[in-house]
């Protein structure tokens, strides 16, 4: 159940049902209207009942139904903001923002793309497309899709290795900088925890509720404890070239729409 491509729709339907159950309302929109297929809708309804019971007797406002840039998914009648995660493992993405936030610490990702020859490789192999060295993304979303689906072999052999080398060097330099400059490191971790970047200003939720649909378990992440212990974290090595660790946090430097092509990001995960 629940292929990766369906996660967004299934997750939103899950939020919607939790809100309906808390508010003692019948759902106005069917599972099919949310893009949820077959018996999956019945399964998600059962899961939503479990989470609503976990949250207790509250009314709520479903912020996710009204804006895609909300600070949380639900606001309870006592003012608590709730972020809901429906996952097969881990706890889902806590925060997603532009990699260009790192310019705050003197690191411009475009310098690495230029140094390792990504722009040159794109121009050489896709001369009929618009390649930008000024924009944050080398190509548009539409062209990214075209490259990945119509020219998969060229993309895999000519572009992906250059991006991997550039990102690896970027993250290694960041790690070295943060180890040598702890104030910058703690500032960065705080920015991600409080969801405050140069390009995206949100608010952290009061509570994060995680439903694991494979294990059928509910857990709550203690965000306050993570923040309290912030000064005890160190910048650690990881098992990949593209991420940093800080205590229970993992920061992954990747791309939203095709590696080396469109929307380079920082994703924050709580372990």
Which residue ranges define each predicted feature?
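Short, positively charged
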Residues: 1-72, 76-80, 85-271
